[in-house]
A protein has these predicted regions:
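Bacterial Sec-dependent N-terminal signal peptides
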Residues: 1-23
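N-terminal leader/targeting segments and the immediate start of mature chains
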Residues: 15-59, 72-73, 202, 207-212
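Extracytoplasmic
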Residues: 41-43, 62-64, 71, 85, ...
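Beta-turn initiation residues at beta-strand->coil junctions
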Residues: 52, 81, 94-95, 170-173
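An acidic-aromatic
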Residues: 64-112, 179
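Flexible, surface-exposed loop/linker segments and immediately adjacent secondary-structure boundaries
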Residues: 105-135
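Gly/Pro-enriched, hydrophobic low-complexity segments
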Residues: 126, 135-212
Length: 212
């Protein structure tokens, strides 16, 4: 599940660093609509671009990815690897190395990062602020409730309010690194549960490492 730490996921009334900041009710209304629109889809297919930049270190990388989500099940293709999960286990498929790693998802861990809660990671742990708006595109700034516990300063969401969808997520790191997810396509998907079941016969020449 570490891949989703890239792929970054009520409000405190008394904070030290942000003691004078309160969440914007208007921002919460918009985010609630995004959550409702996402929950209304039985399955979702997302095509995205991930960008990592750090001008101080002269770093500029980008990768394309695809993610299909159905409840807690998902299929991911990103950064030269694939992942598959049935909601209880996750298979990481390293095609170049002909290796497959199997890990168990800790369902009792409230902080476990899964695709279903990744799309709504902003619901807890943040203060919300409205920023610029151009047409239907609204920027909402997320400030962490506990800044000392995270390695970033803030997250900016770009939301298309006409369809209640996130179009862009940008994280500003404390080390001057910026991580950005650009959503190129976000649409309902029709997919059977069988698509999320790992079939060992499809990978006869692969080494399987069971970490459960």
């Amino acid at each position: 599940m570490k891949i989703f730490l890239l792929v970054v996921s009520l409000f405190a009334t008394q904070l030290s660093t942000f003691a004078q900041i309160t969440s914007s009710p208007e921002a919460k209304v918009i985010l609630d609509k995004v959550s409702a629109a996402t929950d209304a889809m039985e399955a979702i297919h997302i095509v995205f671009e991930y960008k990592l930049t750090n001008k101080e270190e002269n770093i500029s990388d980008s990768s394309m990815g695809e993610l299909t989500i159905k409840k807690d099940q998902y299929l991911l293709s990103f950064m030269r690897l694939s992942q598959m999960s049935d909601g209880e286990n996750v298979w990481t498929i390293l095609t170049d190395d002909e290796e497959i790693q199997i890990a168990e998802i800790d369902l009792e861990d409230e902080n476990a990062l899964t695709p279903s809660n990744l799309l709504k990671m902003y619901e807890t742990g943040f203060m919300y602020q409205l920023q610029d708006k151009v047409g239907n595109l609204q920027i909402i700034e997320l400030l962490p409730e506990n800044p000392a516990d995270v390695d970033y300063i803030k997250i900016e969401l770009l939301i298309d309010t006409s369809v209640n969808q996130i179009k862009n997520l940008k994280q500003f790191g404390k080390n001057a690194t910026e991580s950005e997810y650009i959503i190129n396509n976000f649409a309902p998907s029709i997919i059977s549960d069988e698509a999320f079941i790992f079939k060992e016969t499809d990978y006869v020449d692969f080494e399987i490492i069971d970490l459960r």
